[in-house]
Amino acid sequence: MMIREATVKDAEQLSTLMADVEESNMMLFAPGEREISVDQQRKRMERLETEETSSIFVAEDNYKLVGYLFAIGNSPSRIKHRVYIVVGVRADYRGKGVGVQLFSRLEEWAKKRSIRRLELTVIEHNVPAVSLYKKIGFEVEGVKRDSLKIDGKFVNELYMSKLLSY
């Protein structure tokens, strides 16, 4: 398993992986709902490559992408120290340490950029993800009540964050 920063050459595989992960019904987009072409993904990746406090990390196994982590930074000086995280792992690789490895690589990268705060949201009933985030040091900061509607039911999201020390 290799964890690395994504390049625009990964755009097609990354788009496919994101669609696969969304089949879990635990992401913001419902299965099949995200409409992003490979070209749009490429442009998005090119834009993120130019931002000092943004990056995309991928987990690769035998030349196949099996996980991703978007670190989306900010440019205003008052919030430049934080990044918002979006993470996904292919179903058959969950529970095998891929998420831990992605976050470990993220933290190395973040410390080099003086990023202090990592933040994310997660569906409250996504117990495996919440457990992973707590295991690696994230804390629940609050609840976004009824923030998503999945299969006709309102569900809560948790705000979680981790403060890095360096």
What are these regions (language model features)?
Residues 64-67, 128, 154:
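Glycine-rich acetyl-CoA-binding "A-motif" of GNAT/NAT acetyltransferases
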Residues 155-166:
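Terminal substrate-recognition subdomain of acyl/acetyltransferases
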Residues 16-32:
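Helix-loop element at the rim of GNAT/NAT acetyltransferase active sites that forms part
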Residues 79, 119-123, 134, 139-155:
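Conserved catalytic-core motifs of GNAT/GCN5-like acyltransferases
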Residues 8, 34-92, 103, 109, ...:
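Acetyl-CoA-dependent GNAT
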Residues 58, 70, 84-88, 117-121, ...:
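Conserved beta-strand segments that form the floor/walls of ligand-binding pockets within enzyme
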Residues 103, 110-121:
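Conserved GNAT acetyl-CoA-binding A-motif
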